C-alpha cells in the first residue's frame, strides 16, 4: 500500500489509478484537494458516477458489499465514497476494509474517508492488512518544515513564477495557516499570471488585502517579528479594535509559556492540550518558551495587567502606546 503525506500531494505523480484510496485526517481543504485529484484521474479512466455513503451503522456494510458484488466487467464503472463517522475506531474501519477487499476490481473504485485529529494516526493504522493495490493520503496539520515543502510543490503545480524571498515572505505572513496560504497562492497565480512575483509584489498584495486577526499579531510576536507585529497593531489601532480581545489572547499564550517553563518533566504537549492550544501552534509556543528567560515573560504579563487596569479605569486615550512597548519586550 502506498502512503502519500499531504505536504507531498502536489509532487506525487498520480498517473495510475489505484483500486481504492484511504484519506485520513481532518484538514478540510487538503481532503478536498486529495479528492479532486482522485476524481480527475478517475474521470480519465472512465469513471463518472459516484455513490456517497456515510456510515451510521455497521449494517450499511452489507449494502456496499451487495453493490460491489453487482459490479462486474459488463457494468459501468462506479465510484463508491465511504465516510466513516468521527467516533469510529481504526480497528472497525480495518474490519470493514477486510470484508470489502475481495470485491475490488477494475470497474469499482473505493474512496474511504477516516476523520481523525490525531497527527500520529498512521501509527494506529495497520497498513499491512490493506490490499497492496491501494493508496493512503494523510490530511493532517503541517509543521513549519512541511509547510515549506507543500508550498514549493503547490507553486510548481500552479506554474507560478515567484522568487524564493517572496515565497518565504508568504509563508511567514500566513503563520502556519495553510488554508489561507492556499487561497492566496491561487489568487496570486491569477493576478500575476505569467509574471515574476517578487517581495514587493507580495508586500503590496498583503497591504491591499490584509484584515489581521489577534492570533496573527501574537504569532508575529512569538516569532520575534517585531516589524510585522507593529504593522498589525497599527491596523488594530486605526480600526479601534477592542484591546481586551488582544489582552485575553495574549494572556492565554503567556500563561501557557510560563507553565511550560515551570514544567520539570518536560511534558509540554500535555500542557498545550490541556490549555486547548491549536496543534499547528505547538512548536511555535514551545520554541519561544525555550528561547526566552523568565524575566521577559513576567515583565510581559505585568505590563499586560497594567494595560487592562487602565482600560477598566476608562483611560483609553494612551492604551495603544503600551501595546507597542509590550511588542518590543516580547520580541527582543
From Swiss-Prot:
Species of provenance? Buchnera aphidicola subsp. Baizongia pistaciae (strain Bp)
Q: Which gene encodes it?
A: holA
> What does the function comment of this entry state?
DNA polymerase III is a complex, multichain enzyme responsible for most of the replicative synthesis in bacteria. This DNA polymerase also exhibits 3' to 5' exonuclease activity. The delta subunit seems to interact with the gamma subunit to transfer the beta subunit on the DNA.
UniProt keyword Nucleotidyltransferase present:
yes
Q: Name one Pfam family in it.
A: DNA_pol3_delta
- The identity of this protein, by name, is DNA polymerase III subunit delta
The alphabetized list of GO BP terms reads: DNA-templated DNA replication
This enzyme catalyses: DNA(n) + a 2'-deoxyribonucleoside 5'-triphosphate = DNA(n+1) + diphosphate
Q: Which InterPro entries match?
A: DNA_pol3_clamp-load_cplx_C, DNA_pol3_delt_C, DNA_pol3_delta_N, DNA_polIII_delta, P-loop_NTPase
Keyword annotations from UniProtKB, A to Z: DNA replication, DNA-directed DNA polymerase, Nucleotidyltransferase, Transferase
Amino acid at each position: 500500500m502506498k502512503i502519500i503525506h499531504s505536504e507531498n500531494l502536489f509532487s506525487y505523480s498520480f498517473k495510475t489509478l489505484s483500486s481504492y484510496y484511504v484519506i485520513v485526517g481532518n484538514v478540510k481543504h487538503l481532503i478536498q484537494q486529495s479528492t479532486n485529484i482522485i476524481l480527475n484521474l478517475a474521470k480519465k479512466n472512465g469513471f463518472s458516477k459516484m455513490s456517497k455513503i456515510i456510515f451510521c451503522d455497521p449494517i450499511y456494510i452489507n449494502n456496499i458489499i451487495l453493490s460491489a458484488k453487482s459490479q462486474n466487467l459488463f457494468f459501468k464503472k462506479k465510484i463508491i465514497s465511504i465516510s466513516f463517522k468521527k467516533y469510529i475506531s481504526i480497528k472497525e474501519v480495518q474490519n470493514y476494509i477486510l470484508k470489502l477487499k475481495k470485491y475490488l476490481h477494475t470497474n469499482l473504485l473505493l474512496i474511504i474517508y477516516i476523520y481523525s485529529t490525531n497527527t500520529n494516526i498512521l501509527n494506529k493504522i495497520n497498513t499491512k492488512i490493506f490490499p497492496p493495490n491501494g493508496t493512503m493520503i494523510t490530511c493532517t496539520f503541517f509543521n513549519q518544515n512541511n509547510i515549506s515543502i507543500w508550498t514549493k510543490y503547490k507553486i510548481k503545480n500552479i506554474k507560478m513564477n515567484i522568487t524564493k524571498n517572496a515565497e518565504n515572505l508568504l509563508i511567514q505572513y500566513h503563520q502556519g495557516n495553510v488554508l489561507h496560504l492556499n487561497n492566496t497562492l491561487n489568487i496570486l497565480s491569477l493576478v500575476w499570471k505569467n509574471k515574476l512575483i517578487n517581495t514587493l509584489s507580495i508586500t503590496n498584495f498583503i497591504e491591499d488585502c490584509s484584515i489581521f486577526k489577534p492570533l496573527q499579531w501574537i504569532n508575529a510576536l512569538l516569532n520575534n517579528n517585531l516589524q510585522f507585529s507593529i504593522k498589525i497593531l497599527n491596523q488594530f489601532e486605526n480600526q479601534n479594535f477592542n484591546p481586551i480581545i488582544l489582552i485575553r489572547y495574549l494572556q492565554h499564550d503567556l500563561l501557557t509559556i510560563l507553565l511550560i517553563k515551570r514544567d520539570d518533566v518536560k511534558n509540554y504537549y500535555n500542557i498545550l492540550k490541556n490549555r486547548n492550544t491549536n496543534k499547528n501552534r505547538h512548536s511555535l509556543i514551545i520554541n519561544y518558551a525555550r528561547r526566552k528567560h523568565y524575566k521577559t515573560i513576567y515583565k510581559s504579563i505585568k505590563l499586560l495587567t497594567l494595560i487592562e487596569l487602565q482600560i477598566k479605569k476608562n483611560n483609553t486615550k494612551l492604551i495603544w502606546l503600551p501595546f507597542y512597548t509590550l511588542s518590543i519586550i516580547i520580541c527582543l
